[in-house]
C-alpha cells in the first residue's frame, strides 16, 4: 500500500445488504487521495450496483491492497438485536457508518468524508465519536459517483456476498439475494425444515417478508 497524501485525502462510505432479506448489513469506508482516486477510476471502479458479482469480487482485493479501508459487518443475529433496540433502520445505518469512519480515523487522519444521504443527515453526525466529529462530513444523493464511495460500495458488497455464501453453506441451502418471491420461498422452506428461530440467524426479522413467511409456513 503506497502512502497517501493525508492533506489531499478523503474517505468514502457506503453500505450493502440494506435491502437484502438474508445476510448481514455491511458498511465499508475507503480512504483515497487524488492519485488513488484516478487509479480506481482507471480500474473501472464504480457503484457496485452497476457491476456483476464476479467483477465486484475481482476488484475487491485490488482495492483492499491499494487503499486504507475499514469494514463493519453486522450479522443477522446481531442486526436483529440492534434493530430491536433502535427501532429505526436509518439510525442503525448511521451507527454502522459512524463506527466504520471512527475505525478508519483511528488508524490515519483525513480532513473529510463523503457518504450517501439517507434519512435525516443528523443521524450520522449524532452517532460520530471524537475523531469523526473533527472532520467535514458531506452527505449527498448518488454519492457513489465519487471513486472513494464507489470503492467502499464494492468492499461492502464483496463482504456481503462472501458472508451470505457462508450462511448458505452453514444451513445447507441457497439463501438468495434481495427480497423476491424466490427469497420468500427459500425462507418458507427453512422454517418448515427447521424452525422460525432459525430464520433469525440468517434474515432481517423486521422485514415485512417475515410475516409473509410465517403465515405461509403454518400447517394447513
Task: Indicate residue ranges for each PLM-predicted region.
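RNase H-like, Mg2+-dependent phosphodiesterase core
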Residues: 1-220
Amino acid at each position: 500500500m503506497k502512502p497517501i497524501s493525508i492533506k489531499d485525502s478523503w474517505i468514502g462510505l457506503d453500505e450493502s445488504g440494506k435491502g437484502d432479506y438474508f445476510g448481514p448489513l455491511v458498511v465499508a469506508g475507503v480512504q483515497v487521495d487524488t492519485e488513488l482516486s484516478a487509479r480506481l477510476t482507471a480500474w473501472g471502479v464504480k457503484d457496485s450496483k452497476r457491476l456483476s458479482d464476479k467483477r465486484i469480487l475481482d476488484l475487491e482485493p485490488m482495492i483492499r491492497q491499494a487503499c486504507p479501508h475499514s469494514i463493519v459487518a453486522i450479522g443477522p443475529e446481531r442486526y436483529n438485536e440492534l434493530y430491536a433496540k433502535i427501532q429505526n433502520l436509518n439510525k442503525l445505518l448511521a451507527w454502522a457508518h459512524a463506527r466504520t469512519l471512527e475505525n478508519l480515523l483511528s488508524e490515519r487522519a483525513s480532513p473529510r468524508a463523503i457518504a450517501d444521504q439517507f434519512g435525516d443527515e443528523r443521524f450520522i453526525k449524532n452517532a460520530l465519536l471524537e475523531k469523526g466529529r473533527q472532520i467535514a462530513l458531506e452527505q449527498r444523493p448518488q454519492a457513489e459517483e465519487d471513486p472513494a464511495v464507489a470503492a467502499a460500495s464494492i468492499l461492502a458488497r464483496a463482504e456481503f456476498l462472501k458472508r451470505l455464501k457462508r450462511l448458505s453453506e452453514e444451513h445447507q441451502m441457497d439463501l438468495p439475494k434481495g427480497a423476491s418471491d424466490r427469497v420468500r420461498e427459500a425462507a418458507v422452506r427453512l422454517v418448515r425444515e427447521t424452525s422460525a428461530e432459525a430464520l433469525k440467524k440468517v434474515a432481517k426479522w423486521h422485514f415485512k417478508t417475515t410475516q409473509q413467511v410465517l403465515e405461509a409456513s403454518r400447517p394447513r
